[in-house]
Amino acid sequence: MTWFIDRRLNGKNKSTVNRQRFLRRYKAQIKQSISEAINKRSVTDVDSGESVSIPTDDISEPMFHQGRGGLRHRVHPGNDHFIQNDRIERPQGGGGGGSGSGQGQASQDGEGQDEFVFQISKDEYLDLLFEDLALPNLKKNQHRQLNEYKTHRAGFTSNGVPANISVVRSLQNSLARRTAMTAGKRRELHALETELETISHSEPAQLLEEERLRREIAELRAKIERVPFIDTFDLRYKNYEKRPEPSSQAVMFCLMDVSGSMDQATKDMAKRFYILLYLFLSRTYKNVEVVYIRHHTQAKEVDEHEFFYSQETGGTIVSSALKLMDEVVKERYDPGQWNIYAAQASDGDNWADDSPLCHEILAKKLLPVVRYYSYIEITRRAHQTLWREYEHLQATFDNFAMQHIRDQEDIYPVFRELFQKQSANQSA
């Protein structure tokens, strides 16, 4: 039986190249469909694949066809209803066979098509979802770059310590050397052994010639055996080299209001925003730490599960979260070595006397050390004192941004607005 092994990189996905070309060509339509689809998903289903529909008109190809007017004779095979000069009635409702409601304008060609629907994978979905997004003001910390190295494999070397010896590569070199050094002698030995076999069976016996052949065979075998099995020339060691790694370590503080004024719908929208943020960070950057802080009258640093699923609630003192963030930064994240970011989500309801304190903490302690601070207010009500205090900060600090979310449909556009990749001129 003959076996055919497909060793192509795209062996199981032979249309991958065509698929990628299609995604590039219709990226605008696909991204529009994705931005509409994300609002229909549950909080826990944000990162799966998606069925994308594109209007047929957007994917139509240019083609040659007959012009309108003129007289033409056509033959329709299998026709048993009409004869020459009969007139064919126009189909009812325009004859569109597509997915329209049938209440629009009549179709001039009597035909229609459904929208083109196809499935994109999780990776394709996330790539399109977070395309052109980046953490603002992300900088390389140069003084850490001088001291921070990462070890990489760099082939093999003939010198090294015994711990790094490559046994397989050394034995391969040994076999190659012994084969090269003894190949001629082995061919000569094989010829002498064949000659000895012939003489030993010949009549009359040729004792002197047989003795000579035996001596030569013994000498050749001794020469072959004197070739060492392993030599220092054969030894190979795994080679490692240290390459400087630019340090772009970042930490994101997620501050979520869980006070009693935050109803379940508002909390769900806040969680949806933070899930988008988490997926964006984990997919785009290698080493980004996330610090989760929940607050009502008191703030507490929690893990990921408690941040999204805890039912604890209470009053509202926003400054408690800002104070805790300041303490964590001073304790664990030196601003000279870390890119510090923060995303705060709240419904804007805060104890009136606490809002000026929030302004003071941000202006004097946090905003001078963070790369970017974003505030998202989720409410349908009029803005309160916290929003007005933060407006003063936005006018003073370039690294402070604030956005307003009213409904679930606003989450993704607001997210893209906050983390839109900056141009070179803006970042400068």
From Swiss-Prot:
Bias kind Gly residues: ranges: 92-103
Segments forming a coiled coil: none
Residue spans of biased composition, Basic and acidic residues class: 78-90
Segments for region (Disordered): 78-111
Pfam families noted in UniProt: DUF444 (PF04285)
InterPro entries: UPF0229
HAMAP family, alphabetized: UPF0229
PANTHER family attached to this UniProt entry: UPF0229 PROTEIN YEAH
Record family assignment: Belongs to the UPF0229 family.
Protein name: UPF0229 protein YeaH
Underlying gene: yeaH
